């Protein structure tokens, strides 16, 4: 996913597993067409935890976007849709 974002020239911060970002923070913070977008990357049937839901609500309340894709294909589809939106 990081390689894909780099190939598109998209600014991003990878917080996954850094140990310093705090509990429940999204895995990726991205700027697409000037929009703040957060991604909580999920695997299998792994649902969002309560602390992750709190951060999701805070981001959305602030006007940002939050997504929880379960596959690389779903992630790419979301990013492509956002890239194609009129700014």
Enumerate the predicted regions with their spans:
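Catalytic phosphate/metal-binding cores of nucleic-acid and nucleotide-processing enzymes, i.e., regions
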Residues: 1-87
């Amino acid at each position: 996913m990081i390689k894909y974002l780099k190939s598109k020239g998209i600014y991003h911060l990878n917080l996954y597993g850094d140990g310093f970002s705090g509990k429940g923070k999204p895995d990726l913070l991205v700027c697409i067409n000037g929009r703040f977008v957060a991604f909580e990357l999920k695997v299998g049937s792994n649902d969002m935890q309560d602390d992750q839901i709190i951060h999701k609500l805070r981001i959305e309340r602030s006007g940002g976007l939050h997504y929880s894709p379960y596959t690389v294909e779903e992630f790419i589809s979301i990013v492509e849709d956002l890239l194609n939106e009129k700014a």
